[in-house]
């Protein structure tokens, strides 16, 4: 499905079901150098079980043209712009990694537009190492390898996959390797720079879910626990996975989201 957001086309996958804004809307936002397909397991299920799903491609990602945003504040504004473009008064926002920061920023800036908030593999702050930033700028293929390896628990790197014949590590490397020039660096710098005040986190008043991977080395469990403690009333779910839990533990991730969205 196509929208015009801030003057540019924006693509959103609807889970194989025609989008109906009269249903409860769920907006799903991917991480750095990724696209809507990271939500393939969860988005399709939700779309076939009573939700209007928009798994988006952020600007300069996937099927959405334009320039990559260099600040999380800009990504949060883009998400609100998507709601405006779709005539959506209020939605549940679900984000992974960089996408979790974007939806959190949207909830801070425009709380009246957010019904529920799910933060998957989130850390605040989301510090990025100098080596990773340098590789993204000077040697993107090396940075893509870093993201793929660090983004999965060790067992997922041994050809383990819920899909027979597939390798999660290879699929992630193929996906991030398709990203446009400079996008990974812009995404990582946006993550690294975002430092909201504790008061901003405490101001989040919508029902919030924080989903962590026990084996996540990019946004480790201690960061998820701290975030859940900082947001009033937030619920914490810990999965036996790494950073890419939507594909490493797709059923468990879906179950956590499904139960939370049902409220």
How should each PLM-predicted stretch be described?
Residues 3-16, 40-48, 52-98, 255-258:
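Active-site loop/oxyanion-hole signature of alpha/beta-hydrolase fold enzymes
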Residues 22-31:
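Short beta-strand element of the alpha/beta-hydrolase
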Residues 31-34, 97:
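Active-site glycine-rich loops that stabilize anionic/oxyanionic intermediates
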Residues 101-146:
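Flexible "cap/lid" loop of the alpha/beta hydrolase fold
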Residues 127, 134-203:
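Conserved alpha/beta-hydrolase catalytic His-Asp/Glu region
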Residues 204, 210-212:
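Short beta-strand/loop motif that positions the catalytic acidic residue
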Residues 215-219:
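Acidic catalytic loop of the alpha/beta-hydrolase fold
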Residues 241-254:
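Catalytic histidine-centered segment of alpha/beta-hydrolase-like enzymes
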């Amino acid at each position: 499905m196509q929208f015009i957001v801030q003057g540019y086309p924006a693509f959103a996958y609807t889970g194989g079901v025609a989008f109906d804004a009269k249903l409860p809307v769920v907006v799903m936002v991917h991480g750095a150098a990724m696209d809507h397909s990271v939500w393939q397991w969860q988005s399709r299920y939700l779309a076939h079980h009573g939700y209007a799903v928009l798994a988006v491609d952020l600007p300069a990602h996937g099927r959405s043209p334009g320039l990559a945003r260099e600040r999380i504040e800009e990504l949060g504004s883009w998400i609100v712009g998507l709601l405006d473009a779709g005539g959506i008064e209020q939605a549940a926002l679900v984000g992974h990694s960089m996408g979790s920061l974007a939806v959190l920023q949207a909830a801070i800036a425009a709380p009246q537009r957010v019904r529920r908030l799910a933060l998957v593999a989130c850390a605040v702050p989301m510090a990025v190492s100098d080596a990773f930033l340098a590789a993204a700028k000077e040697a993107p293929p090396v940075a893509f390898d870093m993201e793929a390896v660090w983004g999965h628990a060790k067992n997922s790197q041994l050809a383990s996959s819920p899909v027979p014949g597939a390798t999660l590590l290879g699929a992630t490397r193929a996906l991030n390797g398709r990203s446009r020039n400079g996008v990974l660096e812009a995404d990582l710098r946006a993550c690294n720079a975002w430092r909201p005040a504790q008061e901003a986190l405490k101001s989040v008043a919508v029902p919030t879910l924080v989903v962590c991977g026990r084996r996540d080395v990019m946004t480790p469990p201690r960061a998820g626990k701290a975030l859940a403690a900082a947001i009033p009333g937030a619920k914490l779910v810990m999965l036996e996975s790494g950073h890419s839990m939507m594909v490493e533990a797709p059923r468990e991730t879906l179950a956590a989201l499904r139960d939370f969205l049902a409220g």
